[in-house]
């Protein structure tokens, strides 16, 4: 099961107040973001196919022949999206050199930075950010950010990169959650989610933004029995 499919299942289940036993059903039903299937990949043509293969010579050849570097294929994906899913970093560099837009949103409103962040693909994310891709876009049906998605999944290395790149720390999505809140309510309280929360605290994230019910991050961590997260929040002065 893809990380996007799992992630969106948790998001929707939590929003609807469902038990964890229902998450699997929601997960299957959610319209989730997944990379090209083998059959979809085999059907790619032109720059999309070259991006999927990591064929930089073909990318350069097609770009020189004025191929549209931002052309959209299935699901509204550009060659940049395809290369990101396939972890083809040299292809991303070639596409950027040819003038491709690194910040295009596909049909489900995901950009390359969010795709790499959810995949916990720190190397591809590092390349994208170095090429000038934005960490600040509002993405997904939840009006979230790459940082919120990464915090939700406990991708602490990704979170640190995004913070360094200037991602908005206190963005509130349409579930009324911030990255801090998602690291708690959609996390497992374990090592990586603790490291994620610590990175957000160290960066100066607001620890007192409440969720839709008026609960603070500290109250949410206490309610879940996440003692180590409670300690982190209390040490940082959370109320």
Task: Identify the residue ranges that each predicted region occupies.
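Ankyrin-repeat inter-repeat connecting loop/turn
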Residues: 69, 102, 135-136, 169, ...
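Ankyrin repeat structural motif
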Residues: 55-63, 88-96, 121-130, 155-163, ...
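Intrinsically disordered, low-complexity regulatory segments in ankyrin-centric signaling systems
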Residues: 22-65, 74-77, 235, 239
């Amino acid at each position: 099961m893809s990380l996007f499919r799992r992630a969106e299942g948790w998001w929707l289940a939590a929003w609807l107040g469902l038990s964890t036993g229902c998450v699997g059903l929601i997960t299957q039903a959610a319209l989730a973001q997944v990379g090209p299937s083998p059959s979809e990949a085999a059907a790619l043509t032109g720059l999309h196919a070259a991006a999927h293969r990591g064929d930089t010579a073909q990318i350069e050849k097609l770009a020189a022949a004025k191929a549209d570097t931002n052309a959209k294929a299935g699901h509204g994906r550009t060659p940049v999206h395809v290369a990101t899913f396939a972890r083809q970093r040299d292809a991303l560099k070639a596409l950027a050199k040819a003038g491709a837009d690194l910040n295009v949103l596909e049909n489900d409103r995901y950009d390359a930075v969010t795709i790499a962040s959810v995949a916990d693909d720190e190397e591809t994310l590092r390349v994208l950010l170095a090429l000038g891709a934005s960490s600040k876009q509002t993405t997904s049906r939840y009006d979230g950010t790459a940082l919120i998605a990464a915090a939700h999944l406990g991708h602490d290395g990704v979170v640190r990169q995004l913070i360094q790149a200037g991602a908005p720390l206190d963005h509130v999505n349409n579930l009324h959650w911030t990255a801090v809140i998602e690291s708690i309510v959609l996390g497992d309280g374990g090592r990586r989610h603790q490291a994620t929360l610590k990175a957000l605290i160290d960066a100066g994230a607001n620890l007192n933004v409440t969720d839709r019910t008026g609960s603070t991050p500290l109250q949410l961590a206490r309610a879940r029995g996440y003692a180590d997260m409670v300690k982190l929040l209390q040490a940082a002065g959370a109320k």
